[in-house]
């Protein structure tokens, strides 16, 4: 069962989308995130605040990646001045893309 982590982050400087995309690429390359996660999305809330949604393959994968994630979060806080405002997480019980695949495989009507 997929596991979802949703967080909000505050930056000292206005968000620079290109810089953040470069940082995300660095995280992917450094920590081999594909081993544990399905998707990570960062989105802008306001000029200084962004949200993140991370979808892990399972709760076990979330816990396996947790130490690496802590290292990158510490770096983000110390070097990029990005601090965690709040976080929520839990198992996903309904995922639209999974339902579409399941219905297609079963030849069920889509409406």
State where each predicted segment sits.
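Conserved short loop/helix modules at catalytic or binding sites
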Residues: 77-82
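Short S/T/G/P-rich N-terminal loop/turn motif that feeds into the first structured element of a domain
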Residues: 1-50, 57-71, 83-111
